[in-house]
């Protein structure tokens, strides 16, 4: 099974080059002002040019207004929207129709009962991103470097397309792939030398760890 890999929170040409060079299927740009990974729409539009024909460029937003989304879509020309806030199913459907783009809906998980939150979005969201619930007091809905118990995904309905996120890094990606067997993975803080600072060497290390883990499973 092919594994989609998204490097999220990109802000520099060097990080983009490392992500694409490693074989990222998706590259993500954060449009949430409180995040250290925030990037201006015009700059994201410049950066995403390197990904054309190589990777899916994802615009990550958090309860964004229509006006801000219009600016993002115009300046960046994303291939996909990722909604990482409290957007309800009707809002997801509205934005899909407004922009004609596929939507990935992020949902925070911590226990098996949280899987019930997926059902209202089935048939509306094109894909899900499962992240850990933010630590108490955190202003960031994602990118907190926190993992959840991946074993709860065993209760997921067959056919649900998703990316696994939350606290992934080179040290634990093998366990994550073994326990959850996800169709896709998303990493942000796990390839940073400081909050918001992507490290090309850590990106390369992560891709090596993914390849090693997949080789071990295939052996």
Curated annotation (Swiss-Prot):
It comes from Mesorhizobium japonicum (strain LMG 29417 / CECT 9101 / MAFF 303099). This is N-(5'-phosphoribosyl)anthranilate isomerase. Its EC number is 5.3.1.24. It comes from the Bacteria. Keywords: Amino-acid biosynthesis, Aromatic amino acid biosynthesis, Isomerase, Tryptophan biosynthesis. Belongs to the TrpF family. GO terms for biological process: L-tryptophan biosynthetic process. Gene3D superfamilies: Aldolase class I. It catalyses: N-(5-phospho-beta-D-ribosyl)anthranilate = 1-(2-carboxyphenylamino)-1-deoxy-D-ribulose 5-phosphate. The gene is trpF. Pathway: Amino-acid biosynthesis; L-tryptophan biosynthesis; L-tryptophan from chorismate: step 3/5.
